[in-house]
């Protein structure tokens, strides 16, 4: 889990637009965040396996 202070800091509007960055809406992780879902890769995978994300399914080729 991310530190609460860093999650709160990221939630505020930065003084300069380039300082903004994405965080996972579920756990607060700052890296590997899918913008479309607002989730990190770990949370995205867990929720997809649980069937909580409509339209997402495991692919194989």
UniProtKB/Swiss-Prot annotation:
GO terms for biological process: translation. Binds 1 zinc ion per subunit. Zn(2+) binds at residues 24, 27, 40, 43. InterPro entries: Ribosomal_uS14, Ribosomal_uS14_bact, Ribosomal_uS14_CS, Ribosomal_uS14_sf. One of its GO terms (cellular component) is small ribosomal subunit. Transmembrane segments: none annotated. Keywords: Metal-binding, Ribonucleoprotein, Ribosomal protein, RNA-binding, rRNA-binding, Zinc. Its cofactor is Zn(2+). It holds the Pfam family Ribosomal_S14. It comes from the Bacteria. One of its GO terms (molecular function) is structural constituent of ribosome. Binds 16S rRNA, required for the assembly of 30S particles and may also be responsible for determining the conformation of the 16S rRNA at the A site. Belongs to the universal ribosomal protein uS14 family. Zinc-binding uS14 subfamily. Part of the 30S ribosomal subunit. Contacts proteins S3 and S10. This is Small ribosomal subunit protein uS14B. It comes from Mycobacteroides abscessus (strain ATCC 19977 / DSM 44196 / CCUG 20993 / CIP 104536 / JCM 13569 / NCTC 13031 / TMC 1543 / L948) (Mycobacterium abscessus). The gene is rpsZ.
């Amino acid at each position: 889990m991310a530190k609460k202070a860093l999650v709160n800091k990221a939630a505020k509007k930065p003084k300069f637009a380039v300082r903004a960055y994405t965080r996972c809406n579920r756990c607060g992780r700052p890296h590997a965040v899918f913008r479309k879902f607002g989730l990190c890769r770990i949370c995205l995978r867990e929720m997809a396996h649980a069937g909580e994300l409509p339209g997402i399914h495991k692919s194989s080729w």
